[in-house]
Amino acid sequence: MVIATVDIGGTGIKFAAMSKEGEILEKQDIATPDNLDALLAWLDSCLSKRAYQGIAMSVPGAVDRETGIIGGISAVPYIHGFSWYDKLASYGLPIHLENDANCVGLSELLAHPELENAACVVVGTGIGGAMILNGRLHRGKHHLGGEFGYMLLSEPAETLGELVTSCFDR
């Protein structure tokens, strides 16, 4: 069994073909393209090299795992607002889409099953976070559980400019 793994970030995109045992069979990376068409063309070139049993994607933003839509905002604005499940349906593969910081939290749970409560902070092109509560990943009602990226640091804001500059990101 070989899984296609993709990590979309604000600076770079990474791809790896991984065995069920976690062995990396192939890997590639590129600077994050300027648009969705370029990203999809590169992804297609990666996926066309072998037979895969599924696609696992790590992405910034608020991931609705039922619809495959990435909400919120990130350093890669063109990945938001449409269903990735629909976009990648032509491959005929199961797709697992998850927030990048949540992937860190899930990895910590896998490595440390005794973990009860933890906070994970991801610092890259943007800032993200995940929370482990009672031994489980906390996703939150609106898929933003643990997200620290746009946290108000000062209140009250009298203008939109003050509100934006009081947010914790960039």
Model-derived features with residue positions:
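Glycine/GP-enriched mid-protein hinge/lid loop-to-helix segment characteristic of carbohydrate kinases
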Residues: 16-19, 36, 96-98, 111-170
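Glycine-rich phosphate-binding loop and adjoining helix at the ATP-binding site
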Residues: 33-44, 54-55, 63-117, 153-162
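Conserved phosphate-binding loops in N-terminal lobes of ATP-dependent enzymes
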Residues: 3-59, 66
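Hydrophobic "anchor" residues
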Residues: 24, 70, 137-138
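Short hydrophobic alpha-helix segments
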Residues: 27-30, 74, 141
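Conserved protein kinase catalytic core
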Residues: 13, 64, 106, 128, ...
